[in-house]
Design a protein with these regions (language model features):
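Terminal, basic amphipathic appendages of nucleotide-handling enzymes
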Residues: 1-48, 52-56, 66, 70-80, ...
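Hydrophobic helix-and-loop "lid/oligomerization" segment in the mid-to-C-terminal part
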Residues: 2-3, 8, 13, 19-23, ...
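Short, small-residue-enriched loops and turns at beta-alpha junctions
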Residues: 121, 146-151, 199-201, 218, ...
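Short alpha-helices
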Residues: 127, 205-259, 630
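Acidic, two-metal ion nucleic-acid-processing modules in DNA metabolism proteins
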Residues: 133, 138, 270-313, 317-365, ...
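Short amphipathic alpha-helical segments and helix-helix/interface helices
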Residues: 158, 182-183, 667
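Histidine/acidic-residue-rich, glycine-tolerant segments that coordinate divalent metal ions
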Residues: 172-225
Length: 710
């Protein structure tokens, strides 16, 4: 298992006090202004309200300061959350795009909006299609099939569009890499407008207009728009109105696309998503209304987290498992009964996606169990016959979470061609790694954190070897980035009101994460199963205060902690309504034994490097090399109780954090000579002593020989 350190951000206490006063003062003035009293407040009233506001806003001010926002004016502007949306005409080629589209409308030419099969592509397609239709355009829309067509505009699609007599194609959320396709369209006399947000190649497609904020020569100030965001700007430009006026018409779709595509929720995106989520809550689109009803959000506030975990997966599932057209039909649907049917169909498809994903994760885990040496690879490459290509990217993400290593999952079809999807970890450029093996591949693409590839099955062993050779040269020791904690808290000082104030920082997402709090020296007072044991709920007590916190994905029987253990917890905090009124609740991100520090992550990484055969410096070897007595201490500790074999942090805490590397080496050595084994009980592995006849020689352990330089 990979462990990551926790990094508690440095806090400027003076800045926190200044921010607390500034925020509280503004809140107090607003309360006085909106009060029902006809008389001005007395000084005593004002001061009492100010004092109460300071108590409620101190936590919020602490988060702002921890994230480097120490100027009161900047903080108040951020909390207002209404940054101006810039003029869409600042996007390079936007004028050309508008001119050609308006010409097509005037001449009654048929326009085809060509999108993508993910949430961003579906919402961008619906957004532009409906707007053009409202302008009186003759317009159609088209989405590619993930399996049949692959990503982006294809020559077959262009030929089909041409054969149907359409004269203009407008891409959304794709097209920036369609160099050959653009030339093919031109050869047929079909005009092309590209609107995209992906990073361009050195050469742009030859089109009437190429609108992409990430063009090297783009003149717009904000580069973080998604495909739906660019389509939103195009609609505003076509109407000739400020983009703020468009929010009431299509802000909901732009917000869903932005959140689902994991775009930074800063700058213009923050304004767009805040407004779009408000509109989504009261949308009059039958399709979105039905989807909200289906996921239990009808009539409730909708958050970015709701979009990420409830709405987006259902829309995405259509493109992964079936056809994205089903999702597009739902978004565009105007009949309530039909919308309800389509929304339920998306739920069914999503359940199928989850089941398929779980099957492949299980198959991948069985493969790792059969070949444990794969876990020593710097880059884990797994493949299987006819694994569903629509979910292998999600499976790769799940395995990255579990292993802390870059993972590529490949599905091999009946013709012996493999389609792979990979996910990386911070600090490892997966695209560069794959590019170093280009001669083994049919196709590849992506970026540092995610990539895709096509490869012949017979080349997979060589690909595994070559990628790991590259990783050994470029990243000999792969450290897991730390978990960033915003604030350390005392439960007795945290109130429902202070946590509720944190909503002013929302929407949360990329580059604006949900605040992470460090709860130190908390006692585990209760462990309860949730959802038939899929998750667990903990009662944590710190001093005289306690909180219930859910740990999603942690089965109670897999929890390596027991009642009475003292832990440090990394938590998100929220407020929920109960029969007793508003209550605080937590969501566990990670637990550590109380006081455990950076040495665990650092020394674990060194031992993993040693297992992979990476040469270590003498000082590094000395840090993790146990003497015989230390190995015996570990063995004797295993005699005292059944220790968890997959999360060793409690054992590290018991034997001493600075002994982490030596403890890991000792466990490996004991296992290699057959004195201990990791045995599964109820889906959880524990260390057990192995009965042996005769003595075992620890010096025979390969890991100890490696440390000795043999």
């Amino acid at each position: 298992m990979t462990y990551r350190a926790w990094n508690l951000k440095t806090l400027d206490r003076a800045a926190v006090r200044e921010l607390t006063h500034a925020i509280a003062e503004q809140n107090t003035e607003e309360l006085e202004y909106h009060s029902q009293s006809e008389e001005p407040w007395t000084e005593a009233q004002y001061n009492a309200t100010l004092a109460a506001q300071q108590k409620e806003t101190a936590l919020l001010a602490g988060i702002l300061a921890a994230r480097g926002i120490t100027d009161p004016t900047e903080a108040l502007t951020l909390l207002a959350g209404e940054e101006e949306l810039t003029d869409p005409m600042l996007l390079t080629d936007m004028d050309k795009a508008c001119a050609r589209i308006l010409q097509a409308i005037d001449n009654e030419e048929t326009i085809v909006v060509f999108g993508d099969y993910d949430v961003d592509g579906v919402t961008a397609t619906a957004l532009l299609y409906q707007h053009l239709k409202g302008m009186g355009a003759k317009v159609k829309c088209m989405l590619p099939s993930r399996e049949g067509d692959g990503y982006g505009l294809s020559k077959n699609a262009i030929q089909s569009i041409h054969d149907k007599g359409c004269q203009l194609i407008v891409t959304v959320d794709n097209g920036i890499a369609a160099i050959e396709e653009a030339e093919f369209a031109a050869s047929l006399g079909v005009d092309l407008i590209v609107t995209d947000h992906h990073l361009p190649h050195e050469v742009l497609p030859k089109a009437v207009a190429v609108v992409d904020p990430r063009r090297a020569d783009d003149t717009s100030p904000f580069k973080g728009l998604c495909g739906a965001g660019v389509a939103f700007k195009l609609c505003a430009a076509l109407d000739g109105c400020p983009p703020e006026e468009m929010l009431d018409y299509c802000g909901d779709l732009a917000a869903v696309g932005t959140v689902a595509d994991v775009m930074p929720l800063t700058g213009e995106n923050r304004t767009l998503v805040k407004a779009g989520l408000r509109q989504l809550q009261q949308t009059d689109r039958p399709g979105l209304m039905a989807l909200l009803e289906e996921v239990g959000l009808a009539g409730k506030p909708v958050t970015a987290e709701n979009v990420s975990y409830a709405i987006a997966p259902r829309i995405n599932a259509a493109g992964r498992m079936d056809s994205a057209v089903t999702a597009l039909q739902l978004v565009l649907c105007e009949d309530e009964d039909r919308a309800a049917e389509l929304a339920h169909r998306l739920t069914e498809i999503n359940v199928s996606r989850q089941e398929t994903e779980q099957e492949i994760v299980k198959a991948a885990q069985e493969l790792l169990d059969r070949e444990p040496g794969l876990l020593e690879d710097r880059v884990i490459l797994l493949w299987g016959q006819n694994w569903h290509p629509g979910v292998i990217g999600i499976v790769a993400s799940r395995l990255v979470e579990k292993t802390g290593r870059p993972v590529i999952v490949v599905s091999i079809d009946e013709n012996g061609e493999g389609k792979g999807s990979g996910r990386s970890v911070q600090g490892f450029n997966l695209h560069e790694c794959i590019a170093s093996c280009a001669d083994l591949l049919l196709r590849f693409g992506g970026h540092a954190m995610a990539a895709g590839l096509s490869v012949r099955a017979e080349n997979l062993p060589a690909l595994r070897r070559r990628m790991n050779d590259w990783a050994a040269r470029e990243c000999p020791v792969l450290y897991t980035p730390p978990l960033e904690c915003d604030l350390s808290i005392r439960l007795d000082r945290v109130t429902v009101e202070s946590v509720a104030r944190l909503d002013q920082l929302a929407p949360y997402g990329a580059e604006n994460p949900t605040p992470v709090f460090l709860l130190e020296k908390a006692v585990v007072e209760g462990i309860y199963p949730v959802s038939e044991g899929k998750h667990c709920r903990l009662r944590l007590r710190q001093g005289n205060a306690s909180i219930y916190a859910v740990w999603f994905g942690m089965h109670p029987e897999q929890l390596p902690y027991a009642m009475g253990d003292v832990v440090d917890a990394a938590l998100n905090l929220s407020v929920y309504e109960s029969a007793r009124g508003p209550q605080l609740s937590g969501r566990v991100i990670e637990l550590h034994p109380a006081g455990l520090g950076h040495a665990v992550a650092e020394q674990t990484a060194l031992v993993q490097a040693l297992r992979r055969g990476t040469p270590l410096q003498d000082e590094q070897k000395k840090l993790i090399a146990p003497v015989r007595g230390e190995i015996i201490t570990v063995y004797r500790e295993l005699q005292t109780r059944r220790w968890h074999a997959e999360d060793l942090q409690p054992l590290f805490a018991k034997l001493g954090e600075q002994q982490t590397g030596k403890t890991l080496v000792a466990l490996t050595a004991l296992e290699q000579v057959g004195l201990i084994a990791a045995v599964e009980h109820g889906g959880v592995k524990f260390w057990e002593l192995v009965p042996t006849a005769g003595k075992k020689n620890l010096a025979d352990a390969p890991i100890l020989k490696c440390l000795e330089g043999e």
